[in-house]
Swiss-Prot record:
Compositionally biased spans, kind Basic and acidic residues: 1-20
The UniProt record lists the keyword Hydrolase: yes
InterPro entries: dGTPase, dGTPase-like, dNTPase_2, HD/PDEase_dom, HD_domain, PHydrolase_assoc_dom
Name under which the protein is recorded: Deoxyguanosinetriphosphate triphosphohydrolase-like protein
GO BP of this protein: dGTP catabolic process
Keywords, in A-Z order: Hydrolase
PANTHER family to which the protein is assigned, alphabetical: DEOXYGUANOSINETRIPHOSPHATE TRIPHOSPHOHYDROLASE, DEOXYNUCLEOSIDE TRIPHOSPHATE TRIPHOSPHOHYDROLASE
The species this protein was found in: Mycobacterium tuberculosis (strain CDC 1551 / Oshkosh)
Domain HD: 72-222
GO molecular function term, any single one: dGTPase activity
């Protein structure tokens, strides 16, 4: 079926790489297909073990810190919800965008971006590690659901449009000019699957659904990281109104975000500080009124940033369903600057804290120790599915990739138990 105004997605978008036989366990007379292909894809991600493991993986602070921690799982749920709301305004398929939000961090290793850095060091000589490329690898091969005619895993066997919606960086690490890119969406090992997904797509252009997911991710972690920082008393939003403090944040932001100037960041800090919902938070003291004010702030900021993108995109692209490559997401520069200010607050007052940096250093050391142990003792040290892959790997690079895949799949609890067993000490001594 070709795309139409009623259904802007076509059979090419819905195609799965491996044909699947009909289900056989249903009762007689109940064989009808009541769900769309994208709804089925969303369910596959939601029921996956890889998604559940995100409950014990760090977002900013560890999943066992505080009474109401944000984990990679809760963050993914928030991204999915924000993305779904944006999809309503743009005419994208709701299940498709929600799926992209759920799966956007599904390949992240223990300790979040810090663990990503450590695994990239472990695999530096053999293709490195990137969380977005690992997302694709999990969805197309590592998460068990479907096998092909040769008995090889096809992962969740999602539709082409679903896999593309999760692909924020639709390119390999090598740029074709002899350089290696820091952010990329596919490992060389997964080139065949990547070519299938990107067939007919404009080179290195993410589809609209992936762009929506990407902005929803930015909105979610910038707003919610600040919320968590306020609750933990690490962030005081009154710094936005203090000229000297705001100027220091702007200088830091100019170094971190090369596309935003210090003047733009200063102006953004002033705009945010003058919002009534920001001023209402004041000095947070955990009372009922303070908690209500903070929750209203997060809700209104999410709405501010998401609705600005919807309205600006609509103004540029016009009416009707906006899907796939019919439009690009448009975000006003002043809104991007405001989101950048919130990111800088978290960077300055949470991620740059010396205690946080010391913890991160120990975490990277732990990943290196476990990687060395697994590789030197493989295949006996590997789970059965990874041991089999290790035994059939063609070379050292492929064998190391198997070890990295296993570590990336670990929850933080399991990684720490393995490390403690290796060192012969209690797990608490490693924290």
């Amino acid at each position: 079926m070709s795309a139409s105004e009623h259904d802007p997605y076509d059979d090419f978008d819905r195609q799965r790489r491996v044909a699947e036989a009909p289900k056989t366990a249903g009762l007689p007379g109940t064989e009808g297909q009541y769900r769309s292909d994208f709804a089925r894809d969303r369910a596959r991600v939601l029921h996956s073990a890889a998604l559940r493991r995100l409950a014990d993986k760090t977002q900013v602070v560890g999943p066992r810190e505080g009474d109401t921690p944000r984990t990679r799982l809760t963050h993914s749920l928030e991204v999915a919800q924000i993305g779904r709301g944006m999809a309503i305004g743009l005419g994208c398929d709701l299940d498709l965008v929600e799926l992209a939000g759920l799966a956007h961090d599904i390949g992240h290793p223990p300790y979040g971006h810090n663990g990503e850095r450590a695994l990239d060091e472990v695999a530096a000589s053999h293709g490195g590690f990137e969380g977005n490329a690992q997302n694709f690898r999990i969805l197309t091969s590592l998460e068990p659901k479907v096998v092909d005619a040769q008995g090889l895993s096809a992962g969740l066997n999602l539709t082409r449009a679903s896999l593309d919606a999760v692909t924020k960086y639709p390119w390999m690490r090598a740029d074709g000019l002899g350089s290696q890119r820091r952010k990329f969406g596919f490992y060389d090992d997964d080139r065949e699957s990547a070519v299938w997904v990107r067939q007919g797509a404009p080179p290195e252009r993410a589809c609209l659904e992936a762009q929506v997911m990407d902005w929803a991710d930015d909105v979610a972690y910038s707003v919610h990281d600040v919320e968590d920082g306020v609750v933990s008393e690490r962030i005081d939003l009154r710094v936005l109104a203090a000229e000297e403090d705001a100027a220091a944040l702007a200088r830091l932001g100019e170094r971190e975000f090369s596309r935003v100037s210090a003047d733009e960041l200063m102006a953004a800090a002033r705009r945010l500080s003058r919002l009534p919902v920001v001023a209402a938070v004041g000095k947070y003291d955990a009372t009922l009124s303070a908690s209500v004010a903070l929750k209203r702030l997060t809700s209104e900021l999410v709405g501010r940033f998401a609705s600005a993108a919807i309205a600006t995109t609509r103004a540029a692209a016009g009416p009707g369903p906006l899907v796939r490559f019919r439009a690009d997401l448009q975000v006003p520069d002043l809104v991007r600057a405001e989101v950048a200010v919130l990111k800088i607050l978290a960077l300055q007052f949470i991620m740059s804290d010396p205690r946080h940096l010391e913890t991160q250093a120990r975490q990277r050391e732990r990943i290196h120790r476990v990687a060395h142990r697994l590789y030197s003792g493989a295949p006996q040290t590997l789970d059965p599915v990874y041991a089999a892959a290790f035994n059939t790997a063609a070379d050292d690079a492929a064998r190391l990739r198997v070890v990295v895949d296993q570590i990336a799949s670990y929850t933080e609890g399991r990684l720490e138990r393995i490390d403690a067993d290796q060192l012969g000490v209690s797990r608490n001594a490693l924290d």
